């Protein structure tokens, strides 16, 4: 019989003359002959299981109308010519570049300049860097229809859609890495980080909810109402709710000072805070939506309310590279304003912003 195979790029190929007695190891050899995929790098997946080399096609009950996923792992990095000339032992240099490239992945949460780390390693071994860098390069993120195809492909392997989505989030939307997580499990350090982020988000949300709650003195929780009371008490002062500083009245409200401290201590809570404001103070939420830059500038100011930059004009500088990062995040299917807020809240770290958007981005879009 003829068996159909798919790789992770949705490319199909057919292996002929296969019988129920054909061993999986023999099947891999046929694939190597036809597709030049090394046997050692092949993983054949059917119904969510990795096929063992010593089993036969018949033991897995594979039928001709079915298809098998052929996953080819990345080759081990080889020693470059400059490295070989500098050292007589080939094996140690082969592992060194691999560690250099993986370093940005482990430190991505603390640094916003991962591209500089990769670029620094490139001159010493450009070929190796280009190969090993792919799994963590933001450009390898599957977006839009590409992501949908990747998810469907993994679902067709036999995995639950919820498991696939979880793996994609953990892999920052990288299909190759998500498949590895499905096969081997999500690394414990990533699970721990997600648990810590969830716990921190819950604690910050509780603190923020207390800040939004009415005070014991009977002051209204609605920030616009507080602003109106403040203006009535100080009618001699001109209102600053319009013009170049449409949200300037927030500086005089103690509860906003608390919200600002929460965001400065936990930037990942920005989206949750905006959702809370949308539920409890729709008028303020609309004003923030219409003036996102002014709102972000208020959040960036010092605790005493002084402006960090002169009023008027665009206060946040975005480089061409950062603009491209924002565009790529928008291609994931999120509103641009939400993307900008998440990107800035994550200290302009594209991978962290992507992960945060997949966790919380659609929640804000569902708000009325």
From Swiss-Prot:
<dbReference type="GO" id="GO:0006289">
    <property type="term" value="P:nucleotide-excision repair"/>
</dbReference>
<feature type="modified residue" description="Phosphoserine">
    <location>
        <position position="87"/>
    </location>
</feature>
<protein>
    <recommendedName>
        <fullName>UV excision repair protein rhp23</fullName>
    </recommendedName>
</protein>
<dbReference type="GO" id="GO:0005635">
    <property type="term" value="C:nuclear envelope"/>
</dbReference>
<keyword id="KW-0539">Nucleus</keyword>
<feature type="domain" description="UBA 1">
    <location>
        <begin position="135"/>
        <end position="185"/>
    </location>
</feature>
<keyword id="KW-0597">Phosphoprotein</keyword>
<dbReference type="GO" id="GO:0005654">
    <property type="term" value="C:nucleoplasm"/>
</dbReference>
<comment type="function">
    <text>Involved in postreplication repair of UV-damaged DNA. Postreplication repair functions in gap-filling of a daughter strand on replication of damaged DNA.</text>
</comment>
<dbReference type="Pfam" id="PF00627">
    <property type="entry name" value="UBA"/>
</dbReference>
<dbReference type="InterPro" id="IPR006636">
    <property type="entry name" value="STI1_HS-bd"/>
</dbReference>
<comment type="function">
    <text>Protects ubiquitin chains against dissambly by deubiquitinating enzymes thereby promoting protein degradation.</text>
</comment>
<dbReference type="GO" id="GO:0005634">
    <property type="term" value="C:nucleus"/>
</dbReference>
<keyword id="KW-0677">Repeat</keyword>
<dbReference type="GO" id="GO:0003684">
    <property type="term" value="F:damaged DNA binding"/>
</dbReference>
<dbReference type="InterPro" id="IPR029071">
    <property type="entry name" value="Ubiquitin-like_domsf"/>
</dbReference>
<feature type="compositionally biased region" description="Low complexity">
    <location>
        <begin position="103"/>
        <end position="124"/>
    </location>
</feature>
<feature type="domain" description="UBA 2">
    <location>
        <begin position="320"/>
        <end position="360"/>
    </location>
</feature>
<dbReference type="GO" id="GO:0036503">
    <property type="term" value="P:ERAD pathway"/>
</dbReference>
<dbReference type="Pfam" id="PF00240">
    <property type="entry name" value="ubiquitin"/>
</dbReference>
<dbReference type="InterPro" id="IPR004806">
    <property type="entry name" value="Rad23"/>
</dbReference>
<feature type="region of interest" description="Disordered">
    <location>
        <begin position="76"/>
        <end position="134"/>
    </location>
</feature>
<dbReference type="GO" id="GO:0070628">
    <property type="term" value="F:proteasome binding"/>
</dbReference>
<feature type="compositionally biased region" description="Low complexity">
    <location>
        <begin position="76"/>
        <end position="88"/>
    </location>
</feature>
<dbReference type="Pfam" id="PF09280">
    <property type="entry name" value="XPC-binding"/>
</dbReference>
<feature type="domain" description="Ubiquitin-like">
    <location>
        <begin position="1"/>
        <end position="77"/>
    </location>
</feature>
<dbReference type="InterPro" id="IPR009060">
    <property type="entry name" value="UBA-like_sf"/>
</dbReference>
<feature type="modified residue" description="Phosphoserine">
    <location>
        <position position="84"/>
    </location>
</feature>
<dbReference type="InterPro" id="IPR036353">
    <property type="entry name" value="XPC-bd_sf"/>
</dbReference>
<keyword id="KW-0234">DNA repair</keyword>
<dbReference type="InterPro" id="IPR015360">
    <property type="entry name" value="XPC-bd"/>
</dbReference>
<keyword id="KW-0227">DNA damage</keyword>
<dbReference type="GO" id="GO:0031593">
    <property type="term" value="F:polyubiquitin modification-dependent protein binding"/>
</dbReference>
<dbReference type="GO" id="GO:0043130">
    <property type="term" value="F:ubiquitin binding"/>
</dbReference>
<dbReference type="InterPro" id="IPR000626">
    <property type="entry name" value="Ubiquitin-like_dom"/>
</dbReference>
<dbReference type="GO" id="GO:0005829">
    <property type="term" value="C:cytosol"/>
</dbReference>
<keyword id="KW-0833">Ubl conjugation pathway</keyword>
<feature type="modified residue" description="Phosphoserine">
    <location>
        <position position="364"/>
    </location>
</feature>
<dbReference type="InterPro" id="IPR015940">
    <property type="entry name" value="UBA"/>
</dbReference>
<dbReference type="GO" id="GO:0043161">
    <property type="term" value="P:proteasome-mediated ubiquitin-dependent protein catabolic process"/>
</dbReference>
């Amino acid at each position: 019989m003829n068996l159909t195979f798919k790789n992770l790029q949705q490319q199909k190929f057919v292996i002929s003359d296969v019988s129920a007695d054909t061993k999986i190891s023999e099947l891999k050899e046929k694939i190597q002959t036809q597709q030049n995929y090394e046997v050692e790098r092949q993983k054949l997946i059917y119904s969510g299981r990795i096929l063992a080399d010593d089993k036969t096609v018949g033991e897995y009950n594979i039928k001709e109308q079915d298809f098998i996923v052929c996953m080819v792992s990345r080759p081990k990095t080889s020693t470059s010519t400059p490295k070989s000339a500098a050292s007589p032992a080939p094996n140690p240099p082969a592992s060194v570049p691999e560690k250099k490239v993986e370093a940005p992945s482990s430190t991505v949460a603390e640094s916003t300049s991962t591209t500089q780390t990769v670029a620094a390693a490139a001159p010493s071994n450009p070929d190796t860097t280009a190969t090993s860098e792919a799994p963590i390069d933001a450009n390898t993120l599957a977006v839009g229809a590409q992501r949908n195809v990747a998810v469907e492909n993994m679902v067709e392997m036999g995995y639950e859609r919820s498991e696939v989505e979880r793996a994609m989030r953990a892999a920052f939307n990288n299909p190759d890495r998500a498949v590895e997580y499905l096969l081997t499990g999500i690394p414990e350090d990533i699970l721990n980080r997600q648990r810590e982020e969830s716990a921190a988000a819950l604690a910050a949300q509780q603190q923020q909810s207390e800040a939004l709650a009415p005070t014991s003195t009977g002051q209204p929780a609605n920030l616009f109402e507080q602003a109106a009371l403040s203006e009535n008490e100080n009618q001699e002062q001109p209102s600053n709710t319009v013009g170049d500083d449409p949200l300037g009245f927030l500086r005089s409200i103690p509860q906003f000072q608390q919200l600002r401290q929460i965001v400065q201590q936990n930037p990942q809570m920005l989206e949750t805070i905006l959702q809370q404001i949308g539920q409890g103070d729709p008028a303020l939420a609309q004003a923030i939506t219409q003036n996102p830059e002014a709102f972000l500038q208020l959040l960036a100011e010092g605790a005493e309310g002084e402006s960090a930059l002169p009023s008027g004009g665009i206060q946040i500088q975005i480089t061409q590279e950062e603009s491209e990062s924002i565009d790529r995040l928008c291609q994931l299917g999120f509103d641009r304003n939400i993307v900008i807020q998440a990107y800035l809240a994550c200290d302009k770290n594209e991978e962290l912003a992507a992960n945060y958007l997949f966790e919380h981005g659609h929640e804000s879009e569902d708000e009325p």
